[in-house]
A protein has these predicted regions:
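Structured, active/binding-site neighborhoods that engage oxygen-rich ligands
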Residues: 1-186
């Protein structure tokens, strides 16, 4: 595998990407999973950090300025890449996501999306990654992958796509989920 450790410039881009994701995620958290009309009726325009409202089962336990599992999984992905000197190892990514999920009780608090939850439970119970069904048609992989676009070289499109695909495998193996992640990372 190629070494894709980031340069100083790439590190700055990755940090900017992570900060942007965390801030945007925390800003949007109160309206998580709500349709546009409900968001407008409840909040009007969201222009500052707000706590998750008690009426929103997806956000009711979040404090103002707290980001969601999307950013936590993004950080777990970056930790796995750093641990492996830039090599995209799906099992290392899964391990880091599971460490975060257990640390914050993501399974018990129902923080994870349905696809991530099912895949991570299967992995934790010892099911091999290649035996987990490719049923992840949700957007969880796309939500965590943006910094890979700052890190990966783009000259070799096939290599780029393969690295993003590998990053998706722990939770989202379907073609549509992988395609969405590639678009975000690109």
């Amino acid at each position: 595998m190629s070494d894709i450790r980031p340069t100083y410039i790439a590190e700055s881009r990755i940090l900017g990407c992570l900060f942007g994701q965390a801030i945007g995620d925390a800003m949007g958290m109160p309206s998580e999973l709500w349709p546009k009309r409900r968001i407008i009726n409840h909040f009007g325009w969201i222009e500052r950090f707000l706590p998750g409202p008690k009426e929103n089962i997806a956000a009711c336990e979040f404090r103002a300025a707290e980001f969601t599992d999307d950013t936590h999984q993004c950080i777990a992905l970056m930790d796995a890449l750093d641990e492996n000197n830039g090599v995209t190892d799906p099992l290392a990514i899964a391990r880091h996501i599971l460490l975060w999920a257990r640390r914050c009780q993501a399974f018990e608090k129902n923080i994870l999306g349905p696809t991530s939850k099912a895949s991570l439970i299967a992995l934790e119970q010892g099911q091999p990654l290649d035996e987990i069904a490719a049923n992840g048609v949700t957007n969880g992989a796309a939500m965590r992958v943006a910094p890979m676009g700052c890190r990966l070289p783009t000259e070799d499109r096939a290599f780029f796509i393969e690295q993003v695909r590998l990053s998706c495998l722990p939770t989202h193996k379907s073609d549509i989920a992988i395609a969405g992640a590639v678009v975000i990372a690109w």
